[in-house]
Regions:
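Rossmann-fold dehydrogenase core element
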Residues: 103-122, 141-148
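Beta-loop-alpha module in the N-terminal Rossmann-like domain of NAD(P)-dependent dehydrogenases
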Residues: 48-108, 301
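Hydrophobic residues in well-ordered beta-strands that form the structural core
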Residues: 52, 68, 91, 116-118, ...
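C-terminal capping/lid region of NAD(P)-dependent oxidoreductase domains
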Residues: 114, 141-145, 338-349
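C-terminal glycine/acidic-rich active-site capping loop/insertion
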Residues: 221, 244-324, 349
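N-terminal Rossmann-like dinucleotide-binding module
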Residues: 1-46
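Predominantly a Rossmann-like dinucleotide-binding segment in NAD(P)-dependent oxidoreductases
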Residues: 122-209, 343
Length: 349
């Protein structure tokens, strides 16, 4: 039985608690918050011990794994302390706001022989695995373009719900760093790393924030393909747009909306292709989870992510999203922001 403690009692912590509760060999034993009132409320809801003393929390013999649900720019410090206390760590996206801070996290976890894992649930969808397998099998021929489109909406109230939201120091960026990062990570997971990028960002629909609510980047992948990222929280719609990935090549095209395929076509059809279209095809009227409401996501993919970490611990192997994997999207986003700041000049990743 693995015993979990959660750091931070905000919205995403509820998803962690539900995911842990659904895993047979996992138990939530503690919640830490700087506010004892929040810790008490969370502990009552999820039946775990409340803490407002971080040292007592990370040294508790009743906790094996700590999950981090603090603001993005405040992941390094609690992770460093937890690693030195011998706790394994699962950290919400993004791992941190700069690649350099992620490097510090990776180092301190390695020095203390504890596991560092990130949370990118889209990797665990069956459709994501099918897309990666098709790319690895060369079914696209020469890949021409690999694109990500995340045209979402967040209200002004969303950005005003926490003083840290929309700040460079603690949010690390805007629509690209926070909402688009899941899809950006998936693009890197299936396509490999990006060599260089040109980008522009704008603030269109929100007041009082430092970061972008619209961003566009043109990518050159190391494998020679070109691509585009469009990410926004300024795109209102009645029910929300799905997050799309589009991979197109000389022998095939796949358009994936969230975890469904709008297009799954190859010049050389396999026996499984029609079954894939039937089982994972996009149903008319389906909308993107979290596209307009950040709480409208299913905890099951966090559960799959956590189960992968527990399997890695059981078998002495790397989790699918280790510290180095979690770093990839941060390095790309840092380059995107550098390019946008420099007037769209090419930046190496």
């Amino acid at each position: 039985m693995y015993r979990f403690g959660i750091v931070g009692a905000g919205m995403i912590a509820d998803f962690h608690a539900k995911a842990i509760d659904a895993i047979p060999n996992a138990e939530l034993t503690g919640i830490y918050s700087r506010s004892i009132d929040k810790a008490n409320a969370f502990s009552t809801k999820h039946s775990c011990a409340p803490y407002d003393d971080y040292t007592a929390f990370i040294t508790s013999p009743d906790i094996d794994i700590i999950t981090i649900c603090t603001p993005s720019g405040f992941h390094l410090e609690p992770i460093s302390a937890a690693a030195k206390a011998g706790k394994h760590i699962i950290c919400e996206k993004p791992l941190e706001v700069t690649a350099e801070r992620v490097d510090e996290m990776i180092t301190v976890c390695a020095e203390n022989k504890v596991m560092l894992a990130g949370i990118f649930p889209r990797r665990f969808n069956a459709s994501s695995q099918l897309l990666k397998q098709a790319i690895n099998a060369g079914r696209f021929g020469n890949i021409a373009m690999a694109d990500a489109y995340i045209k979402w909406w967040r209200t002004q109230e969303y950005y005003e719900s926490g003083a840290w939201r929309g700040t460079w120091k603690l949010d690390g960026g805007g629509a690209l760093m926070n909402q688009s990062i899941h899809t950006i990570d998936l693009l890197l997971y299936v396509m490999g790393d990006v060599k260089s990028v040109r980008a522009e960002t704008r603030l269109v629909a929100h007041d009082g924030i430092e970061v972008e609510d619209v961003g566009i980047a043109m990518l050159e992948f190391k494998n020679g393909a070109l691509g585009v990222i469009q990410g926004s929280t300024a795109c209102w719609s009645k029910s929300g747009h799905p997050a799309d990935i589009q991979i197109t090549g000389s022998q095939g095209s796949v358009f994936m909306s969230d975890d469904r395929f709008r297009v799954w076509e190859f010049a050389e059809e396999s026996e499984e292709d029609e079954e894939i279209r039937c089982k994972y095809g996009l149903n008319e009227g389906e909308v993107g989870a979290g596209a307009a409401d950040p709480s409208a996501i299913d905890f099951v993919w966090h559960q799959r992510n956590f189960e992968d970490v527990l399997n890695a611990l059981d078998n002495g192997i790397k989790p699918l999203v280790d510290g180095f994997e979690g770093r990839r999207s941060i390095a790309l986003l840092n380059a995107i922001y550098r390019s946008a700041k420099n007037g769209g000049e090419k930046e190496l990743v």
